[in-house]
Amino acid sequence: MGNNIKVTFNPDKIAAWWPAVGTYYTTTYPQNQSVFQPGIYQTTSLINPKNQQELDSVLINRYKQIDWNTWQGFPVDQKFSLVSRDPPPKPYINQSAQTFEIKPGPIIVPGIRDIPRGLVPPQTPTNRDQGRKPTPPTPPLRDTHPHLTMKNQTFHLQGFVDGLRDLTTTERQHNAYRDPFTTLSPAVPTVSTILSPPSTTGDPALSPEMSPSSLLGLLAGLQVVYFLWTKILTIAQNLDWWCTSLSFPGGIPECTGQNSQFQTCKHLPTSCPPTCNGFRWMYLRRFIIYLLVLLLCLIFLLVLLDWKGLIPVCPLQPTTETTVNCRQCTISAQDMYTPPYCCCLKPTAGNCTCWPIPSSWALGNYLWEWALARLSWLNLLVPLLQWLGGISLIAWFLLIWMIWFWGPALLSILPPFIPIFVLFFLIWVYI
């Protein structure tokens, strides 16, 4: 396993950081100070020094004959350059040599059971070196719940992170130089790889687009669409039965369109199976019924908007006219969005002839005037329509008689239309 040495240069001493021991200032002054240059070196041919004397011997004797331009003679695998290669300032005069030893505790990280590379496990003393010691009464217990003791390891983890932060730099040169006397080893992992949080598995989190409220709204929308689709099919089937019953006052006969290849049972012409010849005609009738229903809805919407005065149409024959200056008559009915509307003409004399648009039934008056201009015989119906409008009691009696006559047949087809009638009534009231 490779070891990292951080070497810094100053006029008096050489400082090095060794993972297993700590930071040293050499007590021996180098003879050739230009040999030692700043950098972080990774080597595999050296063992960890046990004390400062071994480190001085390694730094002074082993590295002073290295050609730093070509890196010849240095047992190094990779070199990570520092941010600044300028020598640090001269230390204080009263600075003394420091020798200390770091005793790292066990680093317990959830999901990572191995010892991180770059750290050397503490050596267990043997009986040969330190003499025989009494056997402890109870062996140390193995930590089986690392997540419960994570708070107690904060100090050791912080020391390990600080040490590796000194080794890492902003710029790395991935140039490996092979040494014939050493064996290459992979680089020491950085803090991000050693102390990376363990990956957790579980239920995937819902994205903001698929929150529970939006999912509920989607399901409710699908239910409403399905309900409306079933009602539309029921309305078409009932209207088809009603239209067919008008052609057969004595009752709807059985369908006679039988297929020679697929014999079908007896059925009504309003519920033909796909194997029957009348199946296509049945769906053609229902398609025409759909078109008529859409046309009725469009007519109802136009009548409602015309009654509210939201369709500004200039009448063909205005009843009242006013003449104003053309400078004041610059806005037409299409450019105004709030009543009252007016229609203006600009003659050559310099004055404008304007007449107001009716506040209600403007489209109806326009269509009636357009029809009277092309069909003159409609003028004969004006007294009749005025008479029917004046005798409201007779009109009510006629309506009651028609409902009494067609009541039983209408009761079977009106229930599917009740939601539509309620919707139209609400639109009529609140618009």
Swiss-Prot record:
Pfam families: vMSA
Main location: virion
Membrane topology (Intravirion): 2-286, 236-286, 401-406
Virion surface side, ranges: 2-214, 308-379, 430-431
UniProtKB keywords: Acetylation, Caveolin-mediated endocytosis of virus by host, Fusion of virus membrane with host endosomal membrane, Fusion of virus membrane with host membrane, Glycoprotein, Host-virus interaction, Lipoprotein, Membrane, Myristate, Transmembrane, Transmembrane helix, Viral attachment to host cell, Viral envelope protein, Viral penetration into host cytoplasm, Virion, Virus endocytosis by host, Virus entry into host cell
This protein's domain notes: The large envelope protein is synthesized with the pre-S region at the cytosolic side of the endoplasmic reticulum and, hence will be within the virion after budding. Therefore the pre-S region is not N-glycosylated. Later a post-translational translocation of N-terminal pre-S and TM1 domains occur in about 50% of proteins at the virion surface. These molecules change their topology by an unknown mechanism, resulting in exposure of pre-S region at virion surface.
Protein name: Large envelope protein
Record organism: Woodchuck hepatitis B virus (isolate 2)
